[in-house]
């Protein structure tokens, strides 16, 4: 009996150590993801809002750096999820798994969308995080999004535009957003405008074709 108890305790200690190791790895993954993006956002703002054309090469390098980080991070998540979703990780670790998938290529996003939905249903991540991934996939497929979380930015440095990507059911948009814990579209637009420094716009009647035509003018 004592031997059995000792074995159980030993196994628990191994599991705890494994979880701590995984959590530590995912902290590093999160930091790499955020650090690369923060630098790119600062450069993007400088070029597009402040007109710092002298930083264009730095911005291009920043975009490439983000892409490299994303590729490395999703390979780590692939390995981590090979035998299924680890249990008993910290909330931040589960959020990191989501954000790496959210920043991955379309095929990886589609591959893991069912897992992300399951994680949100089980309370490991927020329902809004599943909604964001769902919308991102829809936009990449050139389809209307459901929750209005995705935006597109285009224009010239002194005249940038920021539009919410078209949604599939404008009449139900705010109720759909509320169902996953998102703010109203009105509040979201205020938040976007404050964060980006660009007036965020939402046109319920705007189609994908019309939006692409608007973007094409600046290409």
What are these regions (language model features)?
Residues 2-8:
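Sec-dependent signal peptide recognition
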Residues 8-9, 43, 183:
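A periodicity- and composition-biased signal for non-globular, repetitive helical segments
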Residues 69-74, 78-219:
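Short beta-strand and adjacent turn/loop elements
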Residues 12-15:
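C-terminal motif of bacterial Sec signal peptides marking the signal peptidase cleavage site
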Residues 17-86:
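Start-of-domain marker
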Residues 8-10, 22-23:
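Generic N-terminal initiation segments characterized by hydrophobic and/or small/turn-forming residues
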